[in-house]
Amino acid sequence: MKVTGFSFIRNAVNNDYPVVQAILSILPVCDEFVIAVGDCTDNTLELIEGIGSSKIKIIHTVWDESIREGGRTFAQETDKAYAAISKDTDWAFYIQGDECVHENYLPVIKNAMEENLNNENVEGLLFKYLHFYGSYDFIASSRRWYRNEVRVLKFDPGVHSYRDAQGFRKNGRKIKVKPIEAYIYHYGWVQPPAGLGNKVRNFNKFYHEDSWIQEHLPENIEFDYGNADRLIRFEGTHPQVMQKRIEVSNWKFQVDPTLMKKKMSLRRRILQKIEDMSQWRIGEYKNYKTVQ
């Protein structure tokens, strides 16, 4: 069984993406790892090269900045990395530059790959998500935040990244996936206000025209943490690869989590209550088809 990790990145230093930690978090279960490094204006390439693993294959890409709709550039870059995967690969393991997998889940993931390798009804594995927000001590948990996503796929030429690289399609249809008891730790919203404001501004350049950016996200904007709906204190442990990064974090998260929930509309509070009691999220968008 051959497993290949794949991802894409550009300007990880400027945007403070933990891409090295992302790669290292799944590298133990990968036989190779393909990373598409875009046309950076910082030392992202040197950062990736510094990992120093023979498993890592770097491909150089140029991002299409003319596409200002739906984040489709992210899907294009994902597809470039996917296309460079060795053809004898059985499973492709996708990780984005602000995601990590806890080492405790690696045996679960590997076992699921082995158990479903010859199951033609399973085309991918579905992960649960923890969205860290503002601080490494809190996770955002509400209808605003997606609960699951596909991160492991059976390698097939018919698979392509979908929309803004949040999910995948196979020959234009949803992928059949098996849910597993493993989490993706999403750290994209853990930065100080100024840094996160800069990241959000750069990110939105792939969704909106410059005029919209200037109006809604002016330069030097500080991010407003007050729109998460609901924060829950995280009582678990972080991946080992994240420990040093967490230790050097030097900002104070000063948002009162109890005030966020009060901002939710009555409708959202009712829907959230139903979900909390039943685990049923009414109207949930699912970019996949679950199978057992």
Spans of model-derived segments:
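Hydrophobic targeting segments
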Residues: 2-7, 26, 32-35, 184
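Active-site-proximal specificity loops/subdomain of glycosyltransferases
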Residues: 3-11, 16-21, 37-94
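Glycine-rich, phosphate-binding/catalytic loops in enzymes
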Residues: 23, 52, 109-113
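Short, well-ordered coil/turn elements that cap or connect secondary structure elements
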Residues: 28, 51-53, 87, 119-120, ...
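Hydrophobic residues within beta-strands of alpha/beta enzymes
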Residues: 33-34, 92, 125
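Catalytic-site signature of metal-activated, phosphate-bearing donor transferases
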Residues: 74-79, 102-292
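The conserved acidic donor/metal-binding loop of glycosyltransferases
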Residues: 96-100
